[in-house]
C-alpha cells in the first residue's frame, strides 16, 4: 500500500510463476513496494498450492483437481470484498502474472466464477493454451496414479489411493512428483491445471476460438529468448557453464524432447523450418535455433494466438516484445533476454 494511504486507488493483483511446481509470493524479486510507490497503486500478491498438493487430479473423486486455481480465486474474492479498507478501488483491479502465473491469469479470464473480481489483465510470457499449461482428465488421472504407485499406494480404488496419499508427509509427496513424467522432455511440469469441465470447461484453444472469455482490455508480451532458461536443465549439449555449442546430432536429439507428443511428421516439419540448410553444422546457429523452437512452441506462439483471438472479438489488446538484457543478469550471454 502506498504511503500516504490512497483513496480509491487502482489495484494490481500478482500471481507468481514456477511451472505450477514451485514458487512463493514472498521472493524479493516479487516485492510490490517499488511498483506501489512508483505508480501509486495497491499491489497484492498471494500464495497458492503448487505441484501435486495444488494440481493433482483424480476426475470423479473428491479431488477433481485445480485446487491451486481455486486458491487464487479465493484470494481474488477476498480482494474484491476487502480492498476498499486499504484505500483500493474494487472496480479497478488488474490481474497480472508471469510464466505459469500468467498461465494462471488465463483461466480466471475464462471462468465465469472469477470474472467479476477483476477488470483488466496482463499476461507475461505464458498462457493457458500453451502445450505445458494444461492436461486432459485422462492424463491427469494417469499422473495421479503414477505418483501413488511411486509412493507405494494402491491405484485400483480412488478412495484408498487418496487415503494413502493423505497419510504421507507432504515432503515425501513432493519428492516423487518428477516420477510421473514418462518421456524425456523440455519445458514440461508434472502437475498442472486440468480441463475439469468446471473451472476450465473445455480446451483453452476451443474457448478462445469461441470467444468464451471475459471481454476486457488485455496486455500481453514475451521476451526475446523465452526458451534458453529451460535448456540448461537437461537438454542435450546445453549448460550455463559454457557456450552450449550444439552439434547437428544434439540439434536433432533435442527436438523430440521439445515436442514429446509430436509424431514423426511434425518433428520433420520442425527440423525443416528451423534448419539453416547452408550451415547445418554451425554450432552457434544450431544452439540459437533450438532456443527459438522452445520459445516459439511453448511461449511466443501461444501468447500471440491468445492476443489474436482476443482482438478478433473486438477487445483492446496491447502487445510488447521485450528485447533489453538487464545489466545485472546472472546468466551467460548466450541465454539472451530472459
UniProtKB/Swiss-Prot annotation:
The lineage of its organism: Eukaryota, Metazoa, Chordata, Craniata, Vertebrata. Terminates signal transduction at the neuromuscular junction by rapid hydrolysis of the acetylcholine released into the synaptic cleft. It is a peripheral membrane protein. Its EC number is 3.1.1.7. Disulfide bonds join 153-164. Its main location: other. PANTHER family: ACETYLCHOLINESTERASE, ACETYLCHOLINESTERASE 1. It comes from Myxine glutinosa. GO terms for molecular function: acetylcholinesterase activity. This is Acetylcholinesterase. GO terms for biological process: acetylcholine catabolic process; choline metabolic process. It is an enzyme of class 3 (hydrolase). Pfam families: COesterase. GO terms for cellular component: extracellular space; plasma membrane; synapse. It is found in: Synapse; Secreted; Cell membrane. The gene is ache. InterPro entries: AB_hydrolase_fold, AChE-related_enzymes, CarbesteraseB, Carboxylesterase_B_AS, Cholinesterase. It comes from the Eukaryota. The active site is at 99 (acyl-ester intermediate), 226 (charge relay system).
Amino acid at each position: 500500500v502506498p504511503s500516504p494511504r490512497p483513496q480509491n486507488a487502482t489495484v494490481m493483483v500478482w500471481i507468481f510463476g514456477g511451472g505450477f511446481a514451485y514458487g512463493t509470493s514472498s521472493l524479493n524479486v516479487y516485492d510490490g513496494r517499488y511498483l506501489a510507490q512508483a505508480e501509486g497503486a495497491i499491489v497484492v500478491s498471494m500464495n497458492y498450492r503448487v505441484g501435486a498438493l495444488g494440481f493433482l487430479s483424480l476426475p470423479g473423486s473428491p479431488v477433481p483437481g485445480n485446487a491451486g486455481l481455486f486458491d487464487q480465486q479465493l484470494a481474488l474474492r477476498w480482494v474484491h470484498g476487502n480492498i476498499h479498507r486499504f484505500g483500493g478501488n474494487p472496480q479497478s483491479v488488474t490481474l497480472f502474472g508471469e510464466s505459469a502465473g500468467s498461465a494462471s491469469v488465463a483461466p480466471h479470464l475464462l471462468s465465469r466464477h472469477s470474472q467479476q473480481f477483476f477488470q483488466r489483465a496482463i499476461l507475461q510470457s505464458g498462457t493457458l493454451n500453451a502445450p505445458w499449461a494444461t492436461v486432459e482428465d485422462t492424463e491427469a488421472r494417469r499422473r495421479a496414479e503414477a505418483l501413488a504407485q511411486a509412493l507405494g499406494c494402491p491405484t485400483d480404488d480412488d478412495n484408498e489411493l487418496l487415503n494413502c496419499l493423505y497419510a504421507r508427509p507432504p515432503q515425501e509427496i513432493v519428492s516423487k512428483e518428477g516420477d510421473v513424467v514418462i518421456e524425456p522432455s523440455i519445458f514440461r511440469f508434472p502437475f498442472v491445471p486440468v480441463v475439469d469441465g468446471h473451472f476450465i470447461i473445455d480446451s483453452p484453444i476451443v474457448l478462445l476460438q469461441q470467444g468464451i472469455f471475459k471481454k476486457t482490455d488485455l496486455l500481453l508480451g514475451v521476451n526475446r529468448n523465452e526458451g534458453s532458461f529451460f535448456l540448461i536443465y537437461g537438454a542435450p549439449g546445453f549448460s550455463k557453464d559454457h557456450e552450449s555449442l550444439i552439434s547437428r546430432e544434439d540439434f536433432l536429439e533435442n527436438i523430440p524432447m521439445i515436442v514429446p507428443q509430436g509424431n514423426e511428421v511434425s518433428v520433420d516439419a520442425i527440423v525443416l523450418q528451423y534448419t539453416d540448410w547452408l550451415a547445418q553444422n554451425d554450432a552457434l546457429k544450431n544452439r540459437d535455433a533450438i532456443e527459438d523452437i522452445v520459445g516459439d512452441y511453448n511461449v511466443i506462439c501461444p501468447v500471440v494466438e491468445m492476443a489474436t483471438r482476443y482482438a478478433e472479438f473486438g477487445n483492446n489488446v496491447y502487445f510488447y516484445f521485450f528485447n533489453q538484457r538487464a545489466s545485472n543478469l546472472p546468466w551467460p550471454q548466450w541465454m539472451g533476454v530472459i
